[in-house]
């Protein structure tokens, strides 16, 4: 009697994606995010994934935060922290942000000590997130308006601050070698925040990393579109 083999489980995705997949259609320019012209992708950032190195950066920041006695006194603290690394036209960017409308962000320069991945290169960004569907800008620092159907459009999420922060650096835009981003939840011991406690990543090595929320999934595709405005038809 032949031995029955157990069905093989599908391989889990190595990296979480933020803002959809490259197989989708861009809501800003309405081109396919994997569309090519003259053999080259129209979108320098067709999708945003995380990486093992970025998850290690978040682990270190989390450790630093939990050693901050002043912060830990607030046992109700809860926020999302995010990190982004990008190489655009030969220039590298290493950004850190935390969610929330705080004038002073949760993550400060002192919390960036000891990061093993590009030590000393990281900086925090805390741009003002637009309150309405208008007045936004892309990573290329070009103006963009979001669809009015997007709910919670003004949510000051870490991922959004990272992309807006990159745009405000006005990077020279010739080629994108990579742009990666990862998020993680910080929840204080007494925080009554079940919405954040439910975020658990499904990545092969990142069971603790956070998914983007629905509002970010809708907003990120607009912000990562780097197709020049003069090349958008209609």
Regions found by a protein language model. Give the residues of each.
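Catalytic cores of nucleic-acid editing and processing enzymes
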Residues: 1-234
């Amino acid at each position: 009697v032949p031995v029955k083999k157990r069905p093989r489980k599908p391989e889990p995705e190595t990296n979480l994606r933020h803002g959809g997949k490259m197989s989708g259609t861009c809501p800003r320019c309405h081109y396919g995010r994997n569309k090519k012209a003259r053999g080259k992708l129209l979108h320098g950032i067709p999708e945003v994934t995380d990486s093992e190195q970025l998850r290690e950066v978040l682990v270190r920041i989390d450790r630093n935060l939990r050693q901050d006695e002043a912060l830990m006194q607030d046992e109700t603290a809860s926020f999302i922290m995010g990190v982004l690394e990008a190489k655009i036209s030969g220039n590298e960017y290493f950004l850190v942000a935390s969610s929330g409308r705080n004038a002073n962000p949760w993550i400060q320069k002192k919390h960036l000590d000891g990061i093993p991945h590009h030590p000393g290169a990281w900086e925090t960004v805390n741009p003002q997130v637009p309150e309405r569907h208008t007045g936004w800008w892309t990573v290329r620092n070009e103006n963009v308006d979001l669809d009015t159907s997007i709910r919670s459009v003004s949510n000051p999420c870490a991922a959004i601050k990272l992309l807006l922060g990159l745009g405000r650096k006005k990077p020279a835009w010739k080629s994108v070698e990579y742009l990666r981003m990862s998020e993680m939840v910080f929840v204080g011991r007494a925080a009554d925040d079940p919405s954040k406690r439910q975020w658990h990543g499904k990545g092969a090595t990142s069971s603790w990393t956070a998914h983007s929320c629905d509002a970010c999934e809708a907003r990120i595709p607009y912000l990562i579109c780097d197709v020049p405005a003069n090349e958008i038809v209609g």
